[in-house]
Amino acid sequence: MDWILSLLLATVRLAIPVLLISLAELYGQRAGMVNIGLEGLASIGALVGFLVCYVTGSNWLGLLCGALAGILVNMIYAFSTVTLCADHTVYGMAVNIFAPALASFIYRVYFGTGSDLKQITTMASIAIPGLKDIPVIGPLLFDQSPMVYLTFVLVIVTAVFFGKTRAGLSYKSVGEHPQAAATLGINVIGVKYLACVICGALAGIGGAYLTTCYSSTCTDGIVAGRGFIALAAVIFGRWNAGGILLACLFFGFCDALQIRLQVSGIAIPYQFFQMIPYVATVVVLSLIGTRQAGPKANGKPYRREQR
């Protein structure tokens, strides 16, 4: 029972960064912005969040600066794709190449190339009195980091925004038919830039969560493909906040399972266990990816004269 509870606790904690990055992509794609540069945005967010927390001792300030770093880097993608109408895939990949390398360079410039691993104090959990004593559910949902609670609240806010509000419908219209949205007076360019700001912020926070709330260290490759898994989660969740939550919990479970199997003493090379989340991603995309269709204007450049 303790093993199962430990696995479920790890599932929730490991699902959070993927969930934050997935919500970043959801806000982007709902405005027609297919950003495959999530891995890079999360990497720079992880590094900046760690550095700021290391210097100031504030996890919250680290998360905030991680968000700002994600926004700043994503503006390269935004200017290229929205203003210059460049290809989304090319510039997304450029961010994936540039940002992790920049993060690694900054870390080495600041800390040097020594072998000692720098550490910070991760954000403490907050237990909700009464609720935390509920068997199984209590420790899972009511004795967690504040970022876990805030992320679940963000899922609810996102679901309500896109499903129940006029502003959300206007936002989604930019991703479905930007020319029609423009005729209704919607500032399509403004919405797309707003989407890039939100996407950069959430992806940066997702990366900063890994260093300030989960790991306490910052190493090369700490994001470990979660940006690409987040892309799969958006498709798996059918561009719906609730569906994305379930998808991220599934991927979080796969990640938690491979960690537990590595220390279980099974006589199998640990690399096989490390493959589990990525194999699960490929299998999921193979089974359902071809049957899903996102917003109709996803990845398509918008030009005002095309009205």
Map each language-model feature to its residues.
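Hydrophobic alpha-helical transmembrane segments
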Residues: L8-T11, G40, W60-L68, V90, ...
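Single transmembrane alpha-helix segments in multi-pass membrane proteins
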Residues: S6-V55, L63, L68, L72-T89, ...
